[in-house]
Design a protein with these regions (language model features):
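Soluble "head" domains of membrane/secretory-pathway proteins
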Residues: 2-32, 54-60, 68, 72-196
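Hydrophobic membrane-insertion alpha-helices, especially the h-region
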Residues: 35-53
């Protein structure tokens, strides 16, 4: 019986054995390479998520308070830890919602808004080419007002509809309340641009 089994096995020469060995080694190498690539991709994805959460919040714009600078549906990237100056866009949380507004003034500045919606800081009218339309909007803050230290006075670019520092519902934004300085619009691709 054992003789017949031995006779039924094909005889392989050295070249065939070497070819089979190369094929098996190639399959192992290929499987290891695929596994390595998948692990690297998983690591890159985890790092990207951590970076987005810790340093680079990505936000989708809802509403029209920042028209024409930002439109509803735009996606922007903010950077945590950057100091904001007048004219910069920042994101901050109010009542559990992340908002994006423009910094108009910082701590110690005096802000006034006239009946026509012209904004002045420290007595000088601002040149605001980004404003959708000048309007006083909802304003229940006494003007002129002094911006408290370590806070920002913020406004939306579409003044007629924006709820911002002119309203006690939002008020002054503490520096530690900000989630980041908005630096880049990434969507839609046709409007990709730096925003600082």
């Amino acid at each position: 019986m054992s003789e017949s089994k031995a006779r039924s096995l094909p005889e392989l020469d050295v070249e065939q054995l070497q070819a089979e060995l190369r094929r098996v080694k190639y399959r192992r190498r290929f499987a290891r390479s695929v596994l390595c690539i998948l692990l690297v991709l998983a690591l890159v994805a985890a790092l990207a998520i951590a970076a987005a959460y810790l340093w680079l919040p990505v936000l989708r714009i809802h509403g029209d308070s920042m028209e024409n600078t930002l439109l509803s549906g735009d996606v922007v990237v903010a950077v945590r830890g950057l100091e904001a100056e007048a004219g910069d866009l920042i994101t901050f949380e109010v009542n559990g919602k992340l908002l994006v507004k423009r910094v108009i003034a910082k701590g110690g500045d005096v802000v006034s808004i006239d009946e026509d919606g012209v904004v002045s800081v420290n007595g000088a009218a601002l040149d605001e080419p980004y404003v959708h339309e000048a309007a006083l909007g909802t304003c229940d803050v006494q003007m002129p007002c002094v911006v408290p230290e370590n806070t920002y006075f913020v406004m939306g670019d579409h003044r007629a509809v924006s709820v911002d520092s002119r309203s006690e519902a939002v008020g002054f934004i503490r520096e530690d309340q900000t989630a980041g300085k908005v630096v880049l619009r990434i969507w839609p691709i046709s409007r990709l641009e730096w925003l600082y």
